[in-house]
Amino acid sequence: MLSLEDGTLAVKTARNVIEEYVKTGNYSKFELPKTFDRPGGVFVTLSINHDLRGCIGYPYPMEDMSLGEALADAAMSAATRDPRFPRVHKNELDQIRVEVTILGQPELLKCKPLERPHHIKIGRDGLIIEYGLHKGLLLPQVPVEWHWDATEFLENLCLKAGISPDAWVEEKAKIYTFGGQIFEETEPGGPVIEKKIA
């Protein structure tokens, strides 16, 4: 668990990386506390007026990358490499709110496929699906924002992976749950809070 101080530092680091990269095409080396030296999963989400503007990250800890390095890469990628959106332009920087989700270790959901909705807690769990070559991930805050129940969460997870919305009922579909700590700006460039969604 990160403290609010560390979470604030994570969000401010993400913003600094984004602003510098969008303006110059590069970003400077930065220093973070030892908390960020370990490997860890992280996502950076950008929004303008509560509309998604970019979201990229690492669902699993990377052996060759610290949490701090993953954070910086996810921030830069959310601004410039999300295939759903054009690159963030420097004119947008003062409109963008930055959110950082630090992910817990994903755990395989071990139950019969039709029982999966009963083992998912909205507001606590994020989901990952692996279905053959298809993979998809939805962060814990997504079903809360869209007012989905657990079944709708699973269906939309399948759609995110590019498969049929009912593929989650198949044995070959592997579903993983994970927790997350969410830190976000209250306004673009403003104070950072830990977002509670449960």
UniProtKB/Swiss-Prot annotation:
PROSITE patterns associated with the record: AMMECR1
Superkingdom of source: Archaea
SUPFAM superfamilies assigned: AMMECR1-like (SSF143447)
Domain AMMECR1: 5-194
Pfam families: AMMECR1 (PF01871)
Name this polypeptide is given: Protein UNCMA_24250
Organism: Methanocella arvoryzae (strain DSM 22066 / NBRC 105507 / MRE50)
